[in-house]
Amino acid sequence: MRIDRIELRLVRLPLVHFFETSFGRIHDKPFLLVRLLAGGLEAWGECVAEETPYYSSETTETAWYVITGFLGPRLLGLDIAHPREVFPAFRAVRGHNMAKAALEMAAWDLHARAEGCSLGRLLGGVRTRIASGVSVGIQDSLDDLAAKIRTELDAGYRRVKIKIKPGWDVEAVRMVRERFGPIPLMVDANAAYTLADAGHLAALDAFDLMMIEQPLDYDDVSDHARLQRQLKTAICLDESIHSPRVARDAIAAGACRVINIKPGRVGGFSPSIAVHDACAEHGVPVWHGGMLESGIGRTHNIHLSTLPNFTLPGDVAASRRYFVPDLIDPPVDVAPDGTIAVPTGPGIGVAVDLERVERATLRLASLGR
């Protein structure tokens, strides 16, 4: 199949509630949307690059430049028999995994629609529902954090993750344990600490956490291995895992006991499946992370989460936590038992509301005919 046209949009949506990590606080979310048109079909992808280069060196602007100038023209020149061919075709472009993933994942959606099957089935998924966890950002006070967690637990979420940073860590976790007891709980540092903080981080061992996510710098697998030897709590790597090779190296080094998979971070579905399979081979569980995606990207995440080694609840939550209205119909919803139904229609299995997309669009580029 050849792609007739690629549409790229910069869109911005207001968040229902501000979201704060160790990188800072945001009140809205700019991101890129990809729409592929081919043979009377359309398909969608979402680029998870942020406006700022804090989580990743990629930004919405770098992704726009790379997609319009390099990746998009290359994709238009391909005759694609299967979407697994797309990521290798981008090899000449170094890095820029988030830009690559937006196009690659849209190609998977397109192929699933052409085959008349769900994206999850095409990816090799085995589930009809996935377990949903929730990520709670840094709040203005411990009471605000407690109120936020109470709301999420009442909504049925099966696991709570709280963001931490120096000055907002041990006492925040202590409060959660004192008020909510033995709920499934983990923390995410977003690389806010150094190995010199090992003794401080070891204080978290007392709280029976599922894991501590990405405590150290994004490019420091060796120090994560040293830290893991000093902690009882499992380390989960996020920002560090930007390829299947790095995942294998991290496992071999003992740098983590859990891995968070985000397709945007590794370049799309094909490398995500490779990371998933490497982890399964070594008995390392995985879960699906989130990047405050719209319903388009969120639905992609749901489908990938159906693969068998996604054994832990991921950061794939209801649309209403983030965007009202969302860009899809029906929006992503969480059942009272904390699970999300996997869409069964062709491709991502939900309808994209083009009118809402157009209202949110700040910039549009079109490649091809």
Question: Can you annotate each of these PLM segments?
Answer:
Residues R94, M105-V136:
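Glycine-rich, aromatic-flanked loop segments that form ligand/cofactor-binding clefts
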Residues R121-L231:
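Metal-dependent enolase-superfamily TIM-barrel catalytic cores that perform enediolate-based chemistry
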Residues G45, S132-V136, V160-I162, L185-A189, ...:
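Hydrophobic faces of well-ordered beta-strands that scaffold small-molecule active sites
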Residues L36-L37, L41-A114:
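Metal- or metallocofactor-binding catalytic centers and their adjacent structured scaffolds
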Residues I3, V34, G40, L71, ...:
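Conserved, mostly hydrophobic/aromatic
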Residues S22-H27, D154:
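Short Gly/Pro-enriched turn/cap motifs at secondary-structure boundaries
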Residues L71, D208, D219-C236, I241-T339:
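Shared catalytic-loop signature of beta/alpha-barrel
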Residues M1-L15, I26, F31, L292-R369:
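Flexible C-terminal active-site loop/helix
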